[in-house]
C-alpha cells in the first residue's frame, strides 16, 4: 500500500499538503455548524487522513483521501439517503478552512477512499505487476470532470487511469466514470449539509 501511495503522487502534480487534519468547533467553520430547530446548534468535528493540493496565484484545488482498512465503495445513492456523507463533509470543511487560511478560491478536485492493502497479483510478465497492483488498489470516490485537473491528478498513457475511478473515451468519459462538474460537486456539498441538519433534528427528537 505504501508503494501504491508513492506511485499515486509520482503519477500526478498534486502534492500531499497535510496529514491527519483535525477540525471542529474551535475552527468556527460555518459549513460544520448546523442550525437546528428551537435555536439549537450542532457542531461536527473530524480528522481528514490526507489532503493533497495544487494551486495558482488565485485558486487552490483540493484532493481528499480517507484511508480504509477494508474496501469501501463510493455510492451516490447512499449519500442521498444520508448514509455515506463523510467524504463530502470533509471536503466542505477543508474548502472553508483553506479559503480562510489562504484567501484564495478553493475548489474540489476529488474525494476518495483508499484501501490499505497489499494485494497478491498473478501476471504472466513481471512488468505487468505494478499496473495490476495499482488497478487493484484504484481509489473509489468522485472526481472533478475538468480534464486539466484530472491530468494533474494522474498523467495517464495507453494503460488508462490506474489510480482514479475514470475511464476516458474519445468524447470524454464513459458512464462508468465517477465524475461531476464543479457546480455539481458544490451542490453535493449543499445536499449533505441539508442531510446533516435533518439528522441533527432527528437526534433531538429521539429518532435514531
Q: Model regions: which residues?
A:
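Structural signature of nuclease core domains in nucleic-acid processing machines
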Residues: 1-208
